[in-house]
């Protein structure tokens, strides 16, 4: 990894949704879909979807904190998924879709807890936030068919009806954070 870059690992529903948004964020150098938080080494998509591994679908971001801070990444993260839904996002149901932040340092943990505290204090959501904050765990890259999914399949039904609206919301609310 390049000197000065940091890693963020986030789960908030299907990793295709998060991947598509964060690929457009200025300062995010790389986005990779994968699995973490479970007890099986090298899990497959099928195993994770069957719910037998306890893994979450996540994106692992490599970002330049001089361009975008971890806090700003979390602000985008909380705007593109519903952190009040336990083990689901919309019609995607299961523990693999849980809202979770895997932190890579004590500083990230503190920022994550602070941002969640602000959201609660400001009553941004009507229901309790269920986002978990946990230290990083072994991470496994998802299969190639899950990398760059939206870019490869923009007309696919899930992409058109679930991911495209999230991208539109991101572009509307965070145009200043988009890559130029």
Please provide the spans of the model-predicted regions.
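Flexible coil/turn and secondary-structure edge motifs
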Residues: 1-180
């Amino acid at each position: 990894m390049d000197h000065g870059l940091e890693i963020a690992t986030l789960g908030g529903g299907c990793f295709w949704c998060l991947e598509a948004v964060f690929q457009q964020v200025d300062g995010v150098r790389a986005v990779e879909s994968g699995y973490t938080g479970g007890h099986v080494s090298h899990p497959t998509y099928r195993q994770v979807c069957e719910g037998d591994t306890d893994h979450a679908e996540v994106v692992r971001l490599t970002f330049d904190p001089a361009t975008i801070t971890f806090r700003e990444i979390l602000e985008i993260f909380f705007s593109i998924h519903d952190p009040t839904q336990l083990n689901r996002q919309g019609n995607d149901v299961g523990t693999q879709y849980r809202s979770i932040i895997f932190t890579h340092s004590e500083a990230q943990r503190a920022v994550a807890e602070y941002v969640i505290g602000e959201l609660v204090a400001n009553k941004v959501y009507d229901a309790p936030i269920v986002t978990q904050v946990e230290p990083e765990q072994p991470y496994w890259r998802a299969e190639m068919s899950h990398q760059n999914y939206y870019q490869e399949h923009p007309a696919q039904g899930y992409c058109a009806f679930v991911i495209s609206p999230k991208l539109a919301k991101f572009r509307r609310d965070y145009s200043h954070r988009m890559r130029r």
